[in-house]
Swiss-Prot record:
This is Basic phospholipase A2 homolog 2. Changing L130F: Leu in snakes from Caribbean region, Phe in snakes from Pacific region. Residues 1-16 form the signal peptide. Gene3D superfamilies: Phospholipase A2 domain. GO terms for molecular function: calcium ion binding; calcium-dependent phospholipase A2 activity; heparin binding; phospholipid binding; toxin activity. Expressed by the venom gland.
Length: 137
């Protein structure tokens, strides 16, 4: 409960699905999303882009590609609902755009959990100018 409260404090003022994304990451990984992934590697975080540094960073790269494929919705502002049932994220929207947005966020949260063993603290606050150009999605 304390971790959830800390995450909420760190994400105060965050718009749209970013809040839901943060909750999903916390639920799947047990890590504070802002601290652990807010500026991780070349792709995690709002300003991230570039060739992924490791499998964790690749999760964020694929997530950005997923967002780019969305049509008619704004990942930073649109809000969706989901539930956490039996340690599984269940997207609950009838609106196709919001459902796809939720599925993008669900996929990255699961990917980050599946790649916890690749998480490297040296990439936690990686300098973006050191990132090389990535292939197009």
């Amino acid at each position: 409960m304390r971790t959830l409260w800390i995450m909420a404090v760190l994400l105060v003022g965050v718009e749209g699905s970013l809040f839901e994304l943060g909750k999903m990451i916390l639920q799947e990984t047990g890590k504070n999303p802002a601290k652990s992934y807010g500026a991780y590697g070349c792709n995690c975080g709002v300003l991230g882009r570039g060739k992924p540094k490791d499998a964790t960073d690749r999760c964020c790269y694929v997530h950005k590609c997923c967002y780019k494929k969305l049509t008619g919705c704004n990942p930073k502002k649109d809000r969706y609902s989901y539930s956490w049932k039996d340690k599984t994220i269940v997207c609950g929207e009838n609106n196709s755009c919001l459902k796809e947005l939720c599925e993008c966020d669900k996929a990255v949260a699961i990917c980050l959990r599946e790649n916890l063993n690749t998480y490297n603290k040296k990439y936690r606050y990686y300098l973006k100018p050191l990132c090389k150009k990535a292939d197009a999605c």
